């Protein structure tokens, strides 16, 4: 689930978490996680650029770091791990999260920019997008799900909460 900012990631994460806590269904709760490196630059978000991944958590605001710490604590409780937002702990969280996503142990991953480029997990089948994307970033993000995976997955799904039609046409035309 790609979102436009750390604040949006927090809102979605807390909403899903609260829905799971208040659910009266007999089905197992969704396993939801989040990761981000720093708040997206408003100008870059407006035009749809995807920032490079960074493991420098010192660039995060204190509220972003506090939220990420809480989300990592939830993850630690779920998977019986002991990660943190310090530099090595964050990199190890990233690696373990990638492993859990590839193993289909995470039902929903909320990201701002991380995991949208360069991450390969062919079994992923749906990308929800609530952020502006364009050109290379759009093609890279959409490609995360649009990969064939044996006979069970012949295509991926993209669900957008923003109007990305012209950006998609422009990206396909360019590439």
Where are these predicted regions, by residue range?
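Secondary-structure transition/capping motifs at alpha-helix termini
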Residues: 18-29, 103-104, 121, 130-136, ...
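Conserved nucleotide-binding/hydrolysis micro-motifs of P-loop NTPases
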Residues: 6-8, 38-42, 115-117, 132-135, ...
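Generic alpha-helical propensity signal that fires on short helical segments
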Residues: 17-21, 48-53, 124, 142-147, ...
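Conserved C-terminal RecA-like helicase domain
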Residues: 2-111
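Conserved segment of the helicase C-terminal RecA-like domain
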Residues: 103-105, 138-175
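A short beta-strand element within the Helicase C-terminal
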Residues: 108-111, 115-142, 156-160
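Short acidic, glycine/serine/threonine-rich loops at helix termini
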Residues: 12-15, 44-48, 120-123, 139-140, ...
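Short capping/connector residues at structural and topological boundaries
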Residues: 40, 98, 102, 121-124, ...
């Amino acid at each position: 689930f790609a979102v436009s900012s750390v604040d949006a990631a927090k809102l979605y994460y807390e909403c899903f978490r609260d829905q799971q806590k208040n659910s009266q269904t007999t089905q197992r709760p969704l396993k939801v996680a989040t990761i981000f490196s720093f708040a997206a630059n408003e100008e870059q978000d407006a035009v749809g650029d995807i920032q490079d991944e960074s493991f420098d958590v010192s660039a995060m605001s204190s509220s972003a770091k506090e939220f990420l710490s809480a989300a990592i604590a939830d993850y630690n409780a779920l998977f019986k791990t002991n990660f943190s937002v310090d530099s090595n702990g964050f990199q190890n969280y990233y690696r373990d999260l990638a492993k859990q996503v590839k193993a289909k142990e995470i039902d929903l991953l909320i990201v701002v920019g991380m995991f949208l480029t360069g991450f390969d997990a062919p079994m992923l089948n749906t990308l929800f997008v609530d952020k502006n994307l364009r050109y290379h970033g759009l093609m890279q993000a959409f490609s995360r799900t649009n990969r064939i995976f044996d006979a069970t997955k012949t295509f991926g799904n993209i669900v957008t909460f923003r109007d990305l039609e012209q950006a998609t046409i422009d990206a396909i035309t360019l590439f």
